[in-house]
Each structure stands twice: as structure tokens, then as C-alpha cells.
Amino acid sequence: MTMPITVPFVGFTQAELQSFRNASVPDLVGPRLKLLFVGINPGLWTAATQTHFAHPGNRFYPALRLAGIIDRDLDRGRPMTEADRAYFVERGIGITNLVNRATARASELAAAELLAGRTRLEEFVALHQPIVVAIAGVTAYRVAFAVPKATEGEQPVELMGARVWVVPNPSGLNAHQTITSLAQAYAEPAKVAGVIT
């Protein structure tokens, strides 16, 4: 039996990454959506791989694994496989962004883009009807939803019938969080959504 040859994935050059500036990334969503994670916007690595939260330094997938939301490791930095995408859909987990425009840093977004992202998110939630929406990033939430004093955790409002949580951003740039603290924050909305018990 011949074994396939695997070529190590070494990443992207800065020029390659910059070529993905302003690109979009398709939403990961399917029927029977329970828990919708909402990123701020795609990073350049995410746009290059067409995989949400894909930067090698992003702690999203390790935190989901530690929380028991997923039961497999995903190879950060590589494109998500079709089997991985199907696994998320089967679990009732979806991923979208407030703004679907790739930048090197979320701080490159204008406030108007975040406000428009709220409208897009409302339409998305109305269409897909998740039980819980978990928005990853309190600063972006404050701007997009015009709630300047919002804190992380469950919010006192619903979004098109879905309960809303603000959870910490898993970016490696968010030095205040660890994989353990992210896992704890992500487990709470996952329990309410019925993804974990």
C-alpha cells in the first residue's frame, strides 16, 4: 500500500497575506444551529485559509477543545477540512463575523462598519435562529450594539430571539486571557445552547 506524501505547511509570506486584505470568508453554518460564535472580522490568515480563527496564535479551537465543545484538535494555521466543517455543523455550532472584511488587526475597522455589522448579524440570526449568540470581543460589541458599558457574560437583551453572550476574543493579541479562561467563558453559552451538558 502506498502512503500519501504529506508536505509540511510552512505558512504565508507577508506579501501573500497582504494579498488577502479586504477579502471575505464564508460563514460556517448549517441547519439546526444551536450556538453561533461571532468574530469581529477575519484576519489575513483566516482569509488566506478560508477558515475562521485560523491564525496559528489564535486560541479559539484549543479553548473549544478544553471546554468539551469539540472533541478533536484542529490544526491551527491550516485550512479546515470538509470533515471538520461537517463536524461543526452536526454539533450545531456556527461561526460568522460582525464585519466580513479581512484586515491585519480589528482596530483597522471603522465604527460605521461595526454598526453595519450589527444589522447584518440581526439578519443572519433571524434567518438561522441559533439558541445562543456568543460575540467574541467586548470592545467590538460595545461599538456595534451601542452599549458602551457592556461587560463580558450574558447580556440583558436578546438578539432576534437568541440569548446573547459576550465572550473574550481568542486572538493571541488578547494577552489577558489564557486557553483555560477562554474555555471557561465559552463553556457557559455552550451549555445553555445544549452543545455540552
Which sequence ranges carry the predicted segments?
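Internal catalytic-core helix/loop-beta-alpha segment
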Residues: E90-V147
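C-terminal capping/extension of enzyme domains
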Residues: M1-P26, G30-P31, H55-P56, R105-R120, ...
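Short, hydrophobic/glycine-enriched beta-strand segments
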Residues: G30-I40
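Structural motif
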Residues: L33-L35, G92-I93, A162-R163
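Short, solvent-exposed loop/turn segments at secondary-structure junctions
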Residues: N41-W45, N100-T103, T139-Y141, P170-L173
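Short, surface-exposed acidic-centric catalytic microdomains
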Residues: T46-A112
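Residues that scaffold the ATP/ADP-binding catalytic core of kinase and kinase-like folds
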Residues: A47, A63, V143-A144, H176
